[in-house]
């Protein structure tokens, strides 16, 4: 042994004090320090508020992303205790408030006191103290017993003692924090991720209002999640745009004694005419993605209840056809939720519930309710049974089709499917497969690829829309069969094996036209419905071939999007131009001109935010009344004409008072200060937002250093932008690519396939509920929801982006 080697004895054992352990090993407490861990911080704080709601003391939670990137979570619960904590004070030799204990000591909180919380989601008791430890800045405010209190921390350490702010009529807790950039790879909160979880919590906790606001986006309306129907509303939401077999979801609720106290069970279910099963399970509001005893008990009871009803009423269609749980769950949408005093989760991530007593409670309550429901509703029961038998027959047909496909694949395994051009590398981690639209582009991709690790699979035309097809039809589709065989990982719940995937990057490469978009959507629908693990594990990517090639003399560049092209042309046009305001003779050039141009672009962003709410800008301008523009819009009920504009917060409150249901329908057109700031900045130049479309009277003369180009007078702000873009076009050659086949092999490699230069979009699943909703609406059988979606988004489409 090296004499210099340090001795490993008791002196080498380090004890991390307080929250230092959390900062040293954050992954042990929040999973990771990436996007998932960042949002987990918010969930930990929100869960505390929801626990207050579950205990009956809180009715509203407000989550707000601040303009500067911080986030606040407030509730109207009891408020964290602020009295002196005698035990911890004696231990540390100074007076310490209960608030400081909760925020700085691991495994401290009311959740271990069964008199305070019978059930809670924050099982480990490390939540809010972890958030404090991993925050650069953390401020807690408590509103309790008529007084407001505050305490500030940084990276888990107190910066102040408990401060008394003064009297208040509020009650509850407010937490404001800024994640520590020294810990997290990103500190930018994703609105979609947060909204998914908040919507879920509102469904699971009937009667609790959860408000979400995002101050970073001036065009974003606050969202209010409130569902009086609870998980019944959740099932109805999931079945939106689907053809349901009966009107109202079946609902069951009950409580039974468990090993550690009463177990509360709740479930709602409803069948639709589709082919996908959609079941979400929860324990103490925590998603149990791998199920557990509560889901097993429910599924067992469901299968038994259906089979018993068939047997009792002699409804069997064939002695040779045995029904499975898979048949019964085809087209089923269900939510299963339990509240357990002492939940036992398998693994730190709480993905699976393990309490054995929960399974028997779940099975007992489900069985009783379903048996009674089927007997009392024979017509609905018969409709369900008919669907189950059709599903069983389709399963047998799909099994035969699968076996035929597998036999064919085995015979063809030496050369793999059809036109697959495989790569030399055999390690899946290093391999990628391009799914390419058309033989022409496939040929260019074959010539341009790096054959060591890039495989090419050309597909012809539009593949089957699997949203409208049973599994046997999927197996019979030639293009889908080629994809299944090429990937090698199988298909379907029972036959999919991710470890057999031959390429860890599957890249969809289609044309930039409407057909290309349609093919891409069909492929994504297939992967989402039948190989969802590929999306969950982020194996699917979308290639970003350029839309334009711009050349000037010998120089050229590729441009990916219409927005990038507009910016490029505007930048070129602005560089060598100057403007003169004809009324004041004030001239702008260089940075001063860029500032003015950027201000006009802010006006355009404001217009886009209005049009996303289906408010035409010209109509908005016409609504100018008594020196003010409208602040809110109250849309008409579905199918009716004529909405109304509201000009103040008082008018909005009056509308809500007259009709409480209007609260969720009233749109905030913009944050109050946004338009005010725009008008002030435009006023510095003698303009206002009306002048984007309407002339002021005097013009703006644009000139360049090029003597061949005469000065041009613009009379609206829009005209200034359009003219500068036009100047940017002079002297350059623009080629717009409509298809991949228009690029040669070298161009395709340089722009879309070279790992050093290409841009890929990774397909991830942030919100499974919303993804299901969108795929059903856009790709499903029901036409009216799709028409309504298209009509409501029509104003957001730029005419030059339409492929007509």
Curated annotation (Swiss-Prot):
Residues in Toprim domain copies: 431-546
Record keywords, A-Z: ATP-binding, Cytoplasm, DNA-binding, Isomerase, Magnesium, Metal-binding, Nucleotide-binding, Topoisomerase
Name under which the protein is recorded: DNA gyrase subunit B
Site (described: Interaction with DNA): 462, 465
One cellular component term from this protein's GO annotations in UniProt: cytoplasm
Reactions it catalyzes: ATP-dependent breakage, passage and rejoining of double-stranded DNA
Quaternary structure, from the entry: Heterotetramer, composed of two GyrA and two GyrB chains. In the heterotetramer, GyrA contains the active site tyrosine that forms a transient covalent intermediate with DNA, while GyrB binds cofactors and catalyzes ATP hydrolysis.
Matches recorded under Pfam families: DNA_gyraseB, DNA_gyraseB_C, HATPase_c, Toprim
Stored PANTHER family: DNA GYRASE SUBUNIT B, MITOCHONDRIAL (PTHR45866:SF1), DNA GYRASE/TOPOISOMERASE SUBUNIT B (PTHR45866)
An annotated Gene Ontology molecular function: ATP binding
Principal location listed in the UniProt entry: cytoplasm
Organism: Chlamydia trachomatis serovar D (strain ATCC VR-885 / DSM 19411 / UW-3/Cx)
PROSITE patterns with a match to the protein in the record: TOPOISOMERASE_II (PS00177), TOPRIM (PS50880)
Gene of this entry: gyrB
